[in-house]
Amino acid sequence: MKHIRNFSIIAHIDHGKSTLSDRIIQICGGLTEREMAAQVLDSMDLERERGITIKAQSVTLDYKAQDGQTYQLNFIDTPGHVDFSYEVSRSLAACEGALLVVDAGQGVEAQTLANCYTALDMNLEVVPVLNKIDLPAADPDRVAQEIEDIVGIDATDAVRCSAKTGIGVPDVLDRLVRDIPPPEGSPDEPLQALIIDSWFDNYLGVVSLVRIKNGTMRKGDKIKVMSTGQVYNADRLGIFTPKQIDRDVLNCGEVGWLVCAIKDILGAPVGDTLTLARQPAEKALPGFKKVKPQVYAGLFPISSDDYESFRDALGKLSLNDASLFYEPESSTALGFGFRCGFLGLLHMEIIQERLEREYDLDLITTAPTVVYEVETTAKETVYVDSPSKLPPLNNIQELREPIAECHMLLPQEYLGNVITLCIEKRGVQTNMVYHGNQVALTYEIPMAEVVLDFFDRLKSTSRGYASLDYSFKRFQTSDMVRVDVLINNERVDALALITHRDNSQYRGRELVEKMKDLIPRQQFDIAIQAAIGNHIIARSTVKQLRKNVLAKCYGGDVSRKKKLLQKQKDGKKRMKQVGNVELPQEAFLAILHVGKDSK
């Protein structure tokens, strides 16, 4: 046991976590030279295309240290994006230590801080590593000072390495073996294994990634899931050396995978505890706290025949991504679909792309909204995650919107631009601290503004130097209204949006203008209106296509022409009463961009 080291690699986006993992795998000989590829742990196509890590991956390697002993390293490569912070906290729960990788050129950024504090809260040993020292812009001494100033951990002897060229990586491993404590727990106690992650394999059923806290797990054991009480047979188990390798036993302190032929997707929930059926543990391990989704959107299959396969796909995906929430929803305009909850907009994009790619679905997304707290006149409190569920205006006593606490780190010269952006987003400054050339800003900004496009705008105003970390703070009373869209006097539920009263006129007008360009012309006039309650705030008309009925009149009496025009007018009027308008897919997407292009 004292030769096992479990650790995660945490860092901000693009500070070189996955490349460092590659080097560690190479040094320990986990893969042959031929099998080695860049970012070997980013196995999903999407991860490779976007160059980001989405899923945490685990690897078990043997490392011969300088003291001549062989250590077993179990490490987990984690994502750096704020939307996937839940993946990071789950990975950290399985470890005793973490490598905090910081780019020696860019220095400390917001996610570095957030992930590091998560690790320190869990009482993990944090080992700072300065990466990318081969860059001409690298300034390791300044960055080491920054780590001490901003993060507050001692970085005077931080290991310096370059994951790309491989310089200094052996020092990282030696420091790791020296500083990170071995796992606690005893092999003789009843088995307790924590499920860190699961995914669905079409042949094997549910595959779980587990960390053995106490006891040992053998092939063929009867395994009991503590929350459900179900008993399964441990058919296969083993480790990843990135490749799946079968073993007969997983010892105390190890991280490995387990297949129990579970067909039911909810059979082994993430964060649950496994134990032996014949000698069960007294109590379950503390799991993970459930994360609350911050952004909700409706997902609907384009053809209603896909509904069943869409439901199965969501089930399989939610097994792999525990932060995804979904419930059935129906809409008059779009038919049957699901209301899904995500941690942020990037998370939403990734989920939609994974559903479309891995499960061959065509989906329509409605505009993302956040959760509002509504106090009705009957003194009830309801939580509303979709504009169509909002009670009528005269039944609402008070509407509260979620406020996010945003921590930003940015170079001094961009401070003015960023403050202007925050004020425009209805933000309130709560703190500002200078660390050398960096400024740490704390703002309270409404969640609805943060999830819409705040991150993109922050990056563009600061030329990519500012970094952001946000978390839900509280609900606060606010003057929000629902803007409905009426097409030919019929409300289209999928196009409604909730916005602040100050912006509502302007948002309504913008939405109506956008719709006008997107709805194809018909044989009759189409009126597009935006309304708050019964009060119309904007209108535009898609003009009808009409035939020139006077072409056949050559000269002739004016009353003859009037008769023909009147006849055409009556015909169009009848047509308008029975005609209905097909809305194109782009019309639903237009609402996503309302308020974006205007600045």
From Swiss-Prot:
GO biological process: positive regulation of translation
Main location: membrane
Subcellular location field: Cell inner membrane
Substrates-to-products reaction catalysed: GTP + H2O = GDP + phosphate + H(+)
Binding site for GTP: D14, H15, G16, K17, S18, T19, N131, K132, I133, D134
GO cellular component terms, A-Z: plasma membrane
Domain tr-type G: from-to ranges: 2-184
Task performed by this protein: Required for accurate and efficient protein synthesis under certain stress conditions. May act as a fidelity factor of the translation reaction, by catalyzing a one-codon backward translocation of tRNAs on improperly translocated ribosomes. Back-translocation proceeds from a post-translocation (POST) complex to a pre-translocation (PRE) complex, thus giving elongation factor G a second chance to translocate the tRNAs correctly. Binds to ribosomes in a GTP-dependent manner.
Xref: NCBIfam families: lepA, small_GTP
Protein name: Elongation factor 4
Organism: Pectobacterium carotovorum subsp. carotovorum (strain PC1)
Classification of source organism: Bacteria, Pseudomonadati, Pseudomonadota, Gammaproteobacteria, Enterobacterales
